[in-house]
From Swiss-Prot:
Enzyme class: hydrolase
Reactions that this protein is recorded to catalyse: Release of an N-terminal amino acid, Xaa-|-Yaa-, in which Xaa is preferably Leu, but may be other amino acids including Pro although not Arg or Lys, and Yaa may be Pro. Amino acid amides and methyl esters are also readily hydrolyzed, but rates on arylamides are exceedingly low; Release of an N-terminal amino acid, preferentially leucine, but not glutamic or aspartic acids
SUPFAM superfamilies in alphabetical order: Macro domain-like, Zn-dependent exopeptidases
Binding note for cofactor: Binds 2 manganese ions per subunit.
GO molecular function annotations of the record: manganese ion binding; metalloaminopeptidase activity; peptidase activity
PANTHER family with a match to the protein in the record: CYTOSOL AMINOPEPTIDASE, LEUCINE AMINOPEPTIDASE-RELATED
Name listed for the protein in its UniProt record: Probable cytosol aminopeptidase
Annotated source species: Bacillus cereus (strain ATCC 14579 / DSM 31 / CCUG 7414 / JCM 2152 / NBRC 15305 / NCIMB 9373 / NCTC 2599 / NRRL B-3711)
Length: 494
């Protein structure tokens, strides 16, 4: 689909950058010659907009071998960022999709500045082409035909092989993020823990990864009482899923991802209200993020060792469901007093973290739609983060900045640890109260990471959006897929 050329050679549509400068760029000036000065007139009349994310369509009327030009407003060069570029190109590709364009090109060099080189632009363009045009996979009987972009040409004077490589990496990042989106959007009667495990196994087999899927009896043998407690009320069997990618000859410096895989969350006996329960099919967003990252890793084959662990079940009410006041024993041996059955994700993750360590993880990153508290604190754009190791956190932070998936660190103080350790009956309690709820959840998980370098990512606010946006429709976002993959790709770099 993606190709590289030095010159335009007849396309339905070409995407061109337009900055808010006193003079037209050399690329636009060259086009203006073919248009006999008409582009300059359109700019002066403000019919070509340079405002950020503005899309201006100009028909060539036979003046060039391109049918239409789509000028993408980027604002002033000094405020130009990768985030600006992603949003603007996302809108541009959605515009092309609405016009049913099948053959398009991008004048890559017109987007290059001192801040962003052609490789950056190529990566983002290919990534955003997938993200921006993603459509919800629905179960409607009346399905409309989708017109796909079949050919996309990057026009540049830069090295073709380097640009092709960047396009490939960007495309893989976008596609894997969309895979995660599709998982999160699936209804819970379709995506059970068993189906999630089957998906993970297919992924592992496709990319020649080792894998393990523990059944209930094996979990009992290993003492995974926290995950099993959450599963107690369900007719669906639990799964502890592990994918193992060996990118080095020696099994060392292993990065462990742990993704929350609660396929539906009613809250259990600490029952959610109706409005709080609808949408809880997305409570496995952490698992989807981890699987999306493993898809990228499988495609790009970085020289790193990676484990992905997903504790999966639903959390429902029944005569056998676990209850507030229960005391359970986790795989780590630590006992937990259950004060809230709707704080089930941290219980599943506790055993997931311990299992990842057992499999050899030297570094841990857990990802979970864990708390409403993080949404109150940070909103729907920023992922909450907590850590016991600043060096590892800095690497995660740098990866998130590269992918424009912002994270913000929340604290863990000794008094927070005292709150999760405050129980008359057990080593820990799973819900000390609403105050500092996001911090309490992360602090609880830190009790299981112990001395292993660990970062916790709470994506409750960022995993889904209520409305359409520049990088896709309402629904799942695929949050943290690209950040996790970029962390692996860059891990250990100075």
């Amino acid at each position: 689909m993606f190709q590289v050329q030095k010159e335009l050679a007849g396309h339905e549509a070409v995407i061109v950058a337009l900055f808010e400068e006193e003079k037209m760029s050399s690329f636009v000036q060259e086009l203006d010659k073919a248009f006999e000065g008409q582009l300059q007139v359109l700019l002066e009349e403000k019919e070509l907009s340079t405002k950020k994310k503005a899309i201006s369509k100009v028909h060539s009327l036979g003046k060039t071998n391109v049918k239409r030009y789509y000028f993408v407003g980027l604002g002033k060069k000094e405020s130009y960022t990768t985030e600006t570029l992603r949003a603007a190109l996302g809108k541009a590709f959605k515009t092309l999709q609405a016009a049913k364009v099948q053959d398009a090109a991008i004048l890559l060099d017109s987007f290059v500045t001192e801040k962003l080189d052609a490789i950056d632009v190529a990566h983002i363009a290919a990534e955003v082409q997938g993200l921006g045009t993603y459509e919800l996979q629905t179960y409607k009987s009346d399905k409309k035909d989708r017109v796909e972009l079949e050919k996309f040409m990057a026009i540049t004077s830069e090295d073709a092989q380097e640009i092709e490589a960047a396009l490939t990496v960007g495309y893989v990042h976008g596609r894997a993020t969309n895979s995660a989106r599709t998982l999160v959007n699936m209804p819970p009667n379709v995506l059970t823990a068993t189906k999630l495990a089957e998906y993970a196994v297919e992924l592992a087999e496709k990319y020649d990864m080792d894998y393990k899927v523990l059944e209930k009896e094996e979990m009992e043998d290993l003492g995974m009482g926290a995950l099993l407690a959450v599963n107690q009320g369900s007719v669906e069997p639990p799964k502890m899923i592990a994918l193992i990618y060996k990118g080095k000859e020696e099994w060392k410096d292993v990065i462990g991802f742990v993704g929350k895989g609660i396929t539906y969350d009613t809250g259990g006996y600490s029952l959610k209200p109706r409005e709080g329960m609808v949408g809880m099919k997305g409570d496995m967003g952490g698992a989807a993020a981890v699987l999306g990252a493993m898809e990228i890793i499988g495609e790009l084959r970085p020289e790193q060792n990676v484990i992905a662990v997903i504790p999966s079940t639903d959390n429902v009410v029944s005569g056998t469901a676990f209850k507030p006041d229960d005391v359970i024993t986790s795989m780590s041996g630590k006992t937990i007093e259950v004060l809230n059955t709707d704080a089930e994700g941290r219980l599943a993750l506790a055993d997931g973290i311990t299992y990842a360590k057992k499999l050899g993880a030297n570094y841990l990153v857990d990802v979970a739609t864990l708390t409403g508290g993080v949404i109150v604190a940070l909103g729907n754009y920023t992922t909450g983060a907590m850590t016991n190791n600043e060096e590892l956190f800095e690497q995660v932070l740098e990866a998130s900045m590269e992918t424009d998936e912002p994270i913000w660190q929340l604290p863990i103080f000794d008094r927070d640890k005292e709150r999760v350790r405050n129980s008359k009956f057990a080593d820990l309690n799973n819900s000390p109260g609403r105050e500092g709820h996001a911090v309490m959840a992360g602090t609880f998980l830190g009790e299981f990471a112990e001395d292993t370098p660990w970062v916790h990512l709470d994506i409750a606010g960022t995993s889904e959006t209520k409305g359409a946006h520049d990088l896709g429709p309402a629904g799942a976002t695929g949050a943290m897929v690209r950040t996790l993959a970029t962390l692996v790709e860059r891990f250990g770099e100075e």
